[in-house]
Amino acid sequence: MDFYNSSITEHADPDRRWELWKSKYDFAAVPPIPAGQKMAREQLDAAWAKYPEAMSQIRLGAAALSPSPQQRLTEVAELLGAQGPVRIRLIAFVGTFRRSAFSMGVKDGVSTIAIPLEDSAQDHALDMTHEFTHAVQMQQGGWTGQSVASAVFAEGLATRVTERLNPGFPANIYTTSSSAWLERCNASLPQVLDELREHGANSGAQAVSKFTYGTGTAGIDREVYCGGWFVVGRMLSDGVSFSTLGRMTQAEAEGKVAATIDSLLSSSTPATKSGSR
């Protein structure tokens, strides 16, 4: 609110608005890499015109989140067979007006999840499910760090849990994409899977961000989500339960991803439905 009010009071131009955002807010759904600041500036400029009509909801703070975060976390934990408490630090923030929820990983046994206030109740339900899946899965599996292969598993599982607990939407809603993107993903899947398999062992923020935000050699952006949707979909259709997936260690998940990619590449009709149990 301080950032917004100051920008309005000063009639700030885009450059001054960015300075105020940096000094008073500086919180965005961008990767921790040098290009992240450029992305944050572009997001702010694109979203600014939408702020006024959303201010009444933003002023509610965490009370604007619906369904109940506790209720949704419980549902995710039960589906994934959580065996023990799951500790969450929930941050309600002003995002980009385009479903920009994200997870900040686990520290001292607590997962930090950020959910945009300005989104609709439907988007809150979808995104809390997705991000809470990350929290439950990483805590139950004892994950630390991330590789490209483990990111494929994590994002694939989150999209499929979101599908299970929020049924009835087109598949692209679960992958947070356009229908055209999902069609391109499906058409280019062999190339995407080849690339993810080749780079699966790569780790670190820079390596993972390339496949999470960037565009790969197959010409598809967000290859981790593209591959993850189909890879975990195949695991589920092969009879692996959500609870088994939810408790996998990072090493187990990475191995399962590699084996499933091989299975998908040898099949002429990759699984597009979860077949979940």
Functional labels for PLM-detected ranges:
Residues R16-E19, Y25, D194-R277:
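Pan-zinc metallopeptidase signature
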Residues M1-R41:
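N-terminal mature-domain "stem" immediately C-terminal to a signal peptide or N-terminal signal-anchor/transmembrane
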Residues L126-G142, E155-T159:
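Active-site recognition of the HExxH zinc-binding catalytic motif
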Residues T144-E155, T217-D221:
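Active-site metal-coordination segments of metallo-dependent hydrolases
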Residues I113-M128:
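Short pre-active-site segment immediately N-terminal to the catalytic Zn-binding motif
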Residues Y51-K107, E118-A121:
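Auxiliary, metal-adjacent structural segments of Zn-dependent hydrolase domains
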Residues Q139-A149, G168-Y174, D238, F242-T244:
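Inter-helical turn/loop segments and adjacent helix faces that build the functional surface
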Residues M1-E10, V148-L193, T260-S268:
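Post-HExxH zinc-binding segment in Zn-dependent metallohydrolases
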